From Swiss-Prot:
Organism whose genome encodes this protein: Dictyostelium discoideum (Social amoeba)
Compartments in which it is found: Nucleus
Keywords: Nucleus, Transcription, Transcription regulation, Ubl conjugation pathway
InterPro entries reported for this sequence: ELC1, SKP1-like, SKP1/BTB/POZ_sf, Skp1_comp_POZ
Protein name, as recorded: Elongin-C
SMART domains in the record: Skp1
Molecular function terms from GO: protein-macromolecule adaptor activity
Any GO BP: ubiquitin-dependent protein catabolic process
Listed CDD domains: BTB_POZ_EloC
A family per Pfam: Skp1_POZ
Family that this chain belongs to: Belongs to the SKP1 family.
Functional description taken from the UniProt entry: SIII, also known as elongin, is a general transcription elongation factor that increases the RNA polymerase II transcription elongation past template-encoded arresting sites. Subunit A is transcriptionally active and its transcription activity is strongly enhanced by binding to the dimeric complex of the SIII regulatory subunits B and C (elongin BC complex). The elongin BC complex seems to be involved as an adapter protein in the proteasomal degradation of target proteins via different E3 ubiquitin ligase complexes.
Highest taxon of the lineage: Eukaryota
Length: 109
């Protein structure tokens, strides 16, 4: 298997993301590449980030509900990119809008 993150199979390598409270989310590395920040951290052979070697990233400033919504967006984006079907609305709880915007900016999503 190639060490290039762009060639990983969607279901091969898993990544663990942790919220500020330590809640663990497990997803495929490929799904997380919607985030430019995460993709850079996991950039393969030349990556010096500990996150790439441990397959886990801890977000001290992102709450569990916000990180959960971010991950839902990763799956939404992967499903509907290049889709010919109508794009459904992506629901967002008003209580997390500002925090979600900040997280999206940080994650380059």
């Amino acid at each position: 298997m190639s060490d290039n993150p762009d060639t990983h199979d969607l279901n091969s390598d898993v990544l663990r993301l942790y919220s500020s409270t330590g809640h663990e989310f497990v997803l495929s590395r490929k799904m997380s590449y919607v985030s430019g920040t995460i993709k850079s951290m996991l950039s393969g052979d030349n990556s010096n980030f500990m996150e790439d070697q441990n397959n886990e990233i801890r977000f001290r400033e992102i709450s569990t509900p916000v990180l959960e919504k971010v991950i839902q967006y990763f799956y939404f984006k992967n499903k509907y990119t290049n889709s010919t079907t109508d794009l459904p609305e992506f629901p967002i709880n008003e209580k997390v809008v500002v925090d979600l915007l900040l997280a999206a900016h940080f994650l380059d999503t």
